[in-house]
């Protein structure tokens, strides 16, 4: 018994040490997303939802605010996020949005926040200790009445407000008195969309303007090398191509000029898509990052998540965001690390899956098809339901991401008393199983749990066993296993061709001979051979229709193959006029 106790203590210490050494993260970020609080948004099924994120570094911690969460999060490392429940609306605010697309800014030793409103009776709240629910009113009624607001404090201590969300009106800007926190003078028109020039600004899943004019929203401003970068989201939050663009000026209220590289934040491929309506910020080590909205759009247009990517300014002061492998594991920030891709590949794309049961048409293969929009669902949420994936060969497993889906949930709004419990098992032969991860006593809500193993494990089969569901049936949109296979990276893709439509240069058709040993590829393009900042991950295809180009811009393209063993050689850079 003493030996068993000793072994248990050692295993516990190793487990704690492994958790403390977490060095990576994976999008969508794993926070306890609240459920939509709006009844008519959940008619197709109650579901988690948030969007429009802002991350601000304040007193050594990162603070994350987003739409309709009945609170906010703080973190010391950008991985472990701690939720602080808080209602900012007053009883006379007869709206569901708590808060919608909040603005967060720092003045001295104080953090301030306000949500979107067209009314002029919303307070701006302030706190010097936001790790706890310790807030008071800075002003009881902000007279600007701004939707999708954001604030920017300039080097000279002048404060500016930027706002707007419309498919008719522009984004606005105006000065705000630093002391009274009230607007000064009239608002100014700043920028509007030009989708007749910019293909990516066109409305629709396929950028074809087939339903209504596109939306411009989510203003955000950063200053770099004396210039102001006014960022905005377009064309619609429900689309894979939801992205952030940027205009630049020498003055905080313009005039602004469209940056040649746009959109700067874009993620139209992969497991989860979208990278629009966000915020650009610096970490403790002065590295730049961009946080944005990611799209699910199954049970409602506003079913969304949050992603974080490394960003920066190049030698020509071009703002960019690196979304390549943007839902694979990346390194958390340190003094020397800035969101670098780990090189851990997806090991189980479209591999065999077995399950304990299936509910309706939510089939097992949906859990490994690399689409967050589809999911497998068990018949119940009972303890003992399970899903098992076969890697096809013994491989090095470094990390696992468990993406839960919402099926038969019954929650409206935020709950802080729900949690997931599970066990992960591994086997070399599918018969003899060893415990890999034990979260059977977990008491936290982890809808997109990501586990970096302390050491790589050599195995072939991974099984996820349900112990307790936070809400609804046991449903998984992605059981994603990351690591390295045993073979060689894929061979270079041949005959990569880009045909740009001459009658409408916003469009192009990309075609290639697929690599026989690749499951996906990354398409890269940009405005110069050394500025291929835009990337699109495409699974199991040999063509892609691209409708995001700026009409009068020359582009450069390249493509690389991907498999379980690594990344193949990029094709030569191709100029397309």
Predicted regions and their residues:
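Beta-rich carbohydrate-recognition and catalytic domains
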Residues: 21-211, 223-270, 285, 293-336, ...
């Amino acid at each position: 018994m003493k030996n068993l106790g000793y072994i248990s203590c050692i295993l516990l210490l190793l487990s704690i040490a492994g958790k403390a050494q977490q060095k990576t993260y994976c999008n969508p970020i794993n926070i306890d997303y609240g459920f939509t609080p709006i009844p008519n948004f959940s008619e197709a099924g109650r579901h988690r939802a948030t969007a429009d994120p802002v991350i601000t570094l304040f007193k050594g911690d990162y603070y994350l605010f987003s739409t309709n969460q009945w609170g906010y999060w703080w973190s010391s490392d950008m991985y472990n996020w701690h939720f602080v429940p808080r209602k900012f609306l007053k009883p006379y605010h007869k709206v569901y949005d708590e808060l919608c697309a909040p603005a967060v800014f720092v003045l001295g030793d104080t953090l301030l926040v306000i949500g979107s409103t067209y009314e002029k009776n919303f307070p701006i709240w302030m706190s010097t200790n936001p790790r706890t629910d310790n807030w008071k009113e800075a002003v009881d009624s902000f007279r600007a009445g701004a939707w999708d607001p954001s604030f920017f404090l300039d080097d000279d201590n002048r404060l500016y407000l930027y706002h707007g969300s419309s498919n008719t009106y522009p984004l606005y800007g105006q000065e705000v008195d630093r002391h009274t926190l009230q607007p000064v003078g009239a608002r100014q028109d700043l920028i509007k969309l030009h989708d007749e020039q910019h293909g990516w600004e066109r409305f629709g899943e396929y950028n074809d303007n087939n339903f209504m004019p596109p939306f411009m929203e989510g203003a955000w401003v950063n200053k770099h090398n004396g210039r102001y970068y006014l960022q905005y989201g377009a064309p619609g939050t429900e689309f894979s191509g939801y992205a952030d663009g940027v205009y630049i000026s020498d003055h905080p209220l313009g005039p602004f000029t469209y940056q040649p590289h746009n959109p700067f934040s874009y993620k139209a491929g992969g497991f989860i898509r979208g990278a629009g309506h966000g915020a650009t910020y610096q970490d403790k080590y002065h590295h730049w990052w961009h946080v944005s909205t990611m799209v699910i759009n199954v049970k409602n247009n506003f079913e969304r998540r949050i992603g974080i990517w490394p960003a920066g300014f190049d030698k020509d002061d071009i703002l960019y965001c690196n979304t390549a492998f943007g839902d694979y594991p990346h390194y958390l920030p340190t003094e020397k690390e800035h969101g670098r891709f780990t090189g851990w590949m997806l090991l189980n794309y479209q591999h065999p899956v077995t399950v304990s049961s299936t509910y309706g048409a939510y089939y097992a293969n949906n859990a490994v098809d690399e689409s967050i929009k589809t999911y497998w669902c068990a018949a119940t949420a009972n303890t003992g339901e399970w899903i098992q994936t076969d890697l096809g060969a013994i491989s090095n497993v470094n990390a696992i991401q468990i993406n839960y889906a919402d099926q038969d949930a019954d929650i409206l709004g935020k709950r802080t008393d729900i949690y997931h419990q599970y066990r992960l098992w591994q086997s070399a032969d599918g018969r003899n199983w060893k415990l890999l991860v034990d979260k059977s006593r977990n008491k936290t809500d982890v809808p997109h749990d990501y586990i970096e193993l302390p050491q790589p494990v050599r195995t072939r089969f991974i099984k996820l066993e349900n112990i307790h569901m936070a809400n609804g049936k046991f449903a998984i949109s992605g059981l994603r296993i990351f690591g390295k296979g045993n073979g060689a990276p894929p061979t270079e893709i041949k005959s990569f061709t880009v045909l740009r439509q001459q009658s409408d240069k916003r469009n192009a058709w990309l075609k290639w001979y697929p690599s026989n040993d690749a499951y996906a590829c990354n398409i890269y393009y940009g405005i110069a051979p050394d500025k291929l900042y835009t990337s699109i991950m495409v699974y199991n295809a040999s063509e892609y229709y691209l409708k995001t180009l700026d009409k009068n811009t020359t582009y450069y393209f390249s493509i690389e193959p991907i498999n379980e063993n690594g990344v193949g050689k990029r094709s030569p850079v191709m100029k397309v006029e």
